Amino acid sequence: AGPQGPTSCRWCGRVETAFTCPACGGHALRSAVVGARRTAEELGRAFPGVPVERSGAGTVLDVVTSGPRLVVSTPGAEPVAPEGYAAALLLDAWALLDRPTLLAGEEALRRWLAAAALVRPASGGGRIVPAGAPTEVSVPAVEALVRWDPVWFAERELTERRELSLPPAARLATLTGPRA
């Protein structure tokens, strides 16, 4: 469900009407992701005097003007900086990786590479920081970003999918509809 709707299972759709935390007994839930608007507001408070621009739902910027500033954007709405960005902080990396789809890693890497391509080269001082990626395990999409090697990632994914008989190595059909 959306932010205004009831809490429900992302797999089966079952609505949870009486959530209780098994650790503390609390009943309140909060969003796991803050969102671009709130992130921009918090960065504005953390860095007073530094312009903060936001690009995403409602207003997508094509280009930002030169000069020091913080730019917060949603994936796919990254504006171009004329001299390239000094850095890209890829927030909530886990959120893209934790989606219930076979393509989650591919999609995460595609979005990260698109954002990273807007950053100055490392030789020019550019930096890319994936924040919120799991650190307790190796994550191939993050490794591919750090290595700047999407071909390695694609070959690895294809090998695994062949071994497991998953697309694109095999055909798969999904049937959806109301229960009879």
What are the roles of these predicted feature ranges?
Residues 1-176:
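Inter-lobe coupling/hinge segments of SF2-like helicase ATPases
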Residues 180:
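Short, conserved charged micro-motifs
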